[in-house]
Amino acid sequence: MNMKYVLSVINNLRDEWYKPPSCYYHRKRIEFEYQSYARSAIDEICFYLMEHENENPITAVENFRHMVDCFACETKNGDANFMFSVYYDVASDVLDVLLGMQ
């Protein structure tokens, strides 16, 4: 898969699936945090892919997902644990899309 194409698909996912809702102030705090972390996760996945551009994108996203899962398991901080679990969920979504593109 072409890395530029993969990155554009992932950025489109961010804009479509995790776009900031227009009613920010009427949402529950946890929903707002989830959406914010999800958008951040997409950005981190893109950075990770750019750093590992010679690697297969599917393998790179699997490695990213494993890495954040390890972070979630090792942290004792509840807020950080929530963030890493969101990153894991988003990486799983991205991985599903990439596998579907094969």
Description of each model-found segment:
Residues 2, 28-37, 80-89:
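Tandem-repeat/low-complexity and Cys-motif detector
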Residues 1-4, 23, 52, 96-102:
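Short intrinsically disordered terminal tails
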Residues 1-23:
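Extreme N-terminal leader/activation tails
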Residues 66-102:
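Amphipathic alpha-helical binding modules
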